[in-house]
Amino acid sequence: MIDSRHSRSLRSIILALLVPCVAFHVLAQQNEDEGGNDVQGNIDGVQIHRILPSDTDPRIRNYNGDGWFHWAFRSPGVADKGKLVVFLPGTNGKGKPPAAFSKMAAKEGFSVLGLAYPSLVSISTLDKSPDQSAFAKARNNIINAETPFGRFRTEQPDCIRSRLHHLIHFLAEHQPGEGWDQYLLPNGAIDWSRLILVGQSQGGGHALFMAMEHPVERVLMFGAPKDFSKFHHQPAAWYHRPSATPLNRLFSYVHRQDRQGCTYPEQLENYRAVGLLPQYTIVNADESQPPYGGTRLFTATKPFQKSKDAHCYPLFNEVNIPVWKYMLETPID
């Protein structure tokens, strides 16, 4: 049981997460006396933990507290699929995954993590760089703490790979009955084959970059991948790298009015660089039903006045739940 104070706090968190895209910029106010303790509780059948990053690794000093938290979702009463959904938020995201998506995934039997990582600098600030490897250097720095580049100076304890490793170990140790240890190999390394990497905007690009380095179960990109060089008038060079994860395990959903990072025609060039076009047909999610012809690419045409609203629509509007379920669960040959 959780006390009424924690119950009220959890419900305020869920309400805040349900506000489209605001979850990436505005945090629900937390009681200061909660300190570094992880908020725990069961909301609508979903067990939720909020974890202070430094509790998982004492070396962590940055992007820690003051809104920066890791999150974990799971449904105890649902058959465990043995797959871990790892959510990487976009620029200025502080770790909280979208509530509707996370609760849906948990109720489908997935374990879900939201990771707090260094996300304050937009990757799109590099789109005018003459360095064709600029996008890759920045992402490699954030993910692996390698290749310091410009404003990207990630310390090793703060990089995505290290934080994810320590978070899974922390949950396996402190929540031993929840099955987090199944996502670790006998030697303690992450079992990438069980991971589904999900990212929005900047986080979607990180998910793809990581999938090229590690063979993951699948990748879900929302409002991504967006790395397009305005200087060279072409997609990021790293899209052409060999990938450890096959093409048929990559999914993307970008609204046609989304101009964040790149225009929609430039988005299509990114798909071609990755290889998703012409391999797959782009399906309009607003006008289609599962199984969507087996595609890996989605768009939408619901009109918006602002590009940012279109950018958020694929992952922050519950009308897309059928698409989310398809992307998570459609069989892969």
Predicted feature descriptions by range:
Residues 99-114:
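Short amphipathic alpha-helix adjacent to the substrate-entry channel of hydrolases
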Residues 72-76, 217-312:
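The feature captures the conserved acid-bearing segment of alpha/beta-hydrolase catalytic domains
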Residues 185-199:
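Alpha/beta-hydrolase fold nucleophile elbow
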Residues 30-78:
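N-terminal cap/lid segment of alpha/beta-hydrolase-fold proteins
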Residues 82-90:
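Short beta-strand element of the alpha/beta-hydrolase
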Residues 198-203, 207:
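Gly/Ala-rich beta-loop-alpha elbow adjacent to hydrolase catalytic centers
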Residues 133-187:
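Alpha/beta-hydrolase active-site loop
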